A protein has these predicted regions:
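Beta-propeller-forming repeat regions
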Residues: 1-223
């Protein structure tokens, strides 16, 4: 049976109004990550149906361990009519606060891929109102193809989450691109050698494989 909206957070953290530091991020299920995204010390709930990053929602946590109403990430990011909003959430810097990679793009109606209107790596904490970050920086994920999905991956074999990008490369091409994370800096820029090693070229009729269990490599189930 589904847990009521105001029930305690899985994994536990601040209870009975006690303002304690949030516990480490954990998985409520395969598509739901619980962790502190806004930096208030209380875990928030990030739901990612289908693991594509395009239908992500956030429920902000409170001091008593409950979660609020669902907010669509696309709306918080200010996606315009016709735009596709993609997001990936993880503690890329392993500092205890979740971070986000975002991409906003209007899908192309021809052979050439569209360039992203917004493509950023946003280290946490993020503002609740619009998911902005005081230390946001441009990400080149929107410069090398039209992003269709963003997924967490484990390519480096270390403790730092990496990024898998499913993108339209134009003229029927559909590729898996990658960005590996470096300690302290978040997902890096395009690297041809890494793209050859970990990426995959495909087409719309024969798309590349994409990771579906990225969070599981880095986060344990909530107790």
């Amino acid at each position: 049976m589904a847990r009521p909206r105001d029930a305690p957070a899985p994994g536990g953290t601040a209870r009975a109004g006690k303002a304690t530091a949030a516990t480490a991020p954990c998985l409520a299920d395969a598509t739901t990550l619980v962790g502190d995204l806004d930096g208030d010390g209380h875990p928030d709930k990030i739901s990612n149906p289908g693991i594509t990053g395009t239908r992500m929602t956030i429920q902000w946590g409170s001091a008593n361990g409950s979660f609020g109403t669902k907010h669509a990430v696309s709306a918080l990011l200010g996606a315009r009519k016709g735009e596709v909003a993609s997001a990936a959430v993880a503690d890329f810097q392993r500092d205890g606060t979740l971070d986000m990679v975002v991409n906003l793009v209007t899908p192309a109606d021809g052979g050439d891929p569209s360039t992203a209107r917004v493509a950023q790596y946003r280290p946490g904490p993020l503002k609740r109102a619009n998911l902005t970050s005081a230390h946001a920086r441009h990400s080149d994920i929107g410069d090398h193809g039209e992003v269709q999905q963003l997924r967490i991956a484990n390519y480096g074999g270390d403790a730092y989450p990496d990024l898998a990008i499913l993108d339209n490369s134009g003229d029927g091409g559909l590729d898996r691109d990658v960005r590996l994370t470096k300690p302290g800096s978040g997902p890096g820029n395009f690297d041809y050698q890494l793209a050859v090693k970990y990426g995959e070229f495909g087409t719309t009729s024969e798309p590349p494989t994409v990771p579906g269990d990225g969070w599981k490599h880095f986060y344990k189930p909530c107790s």
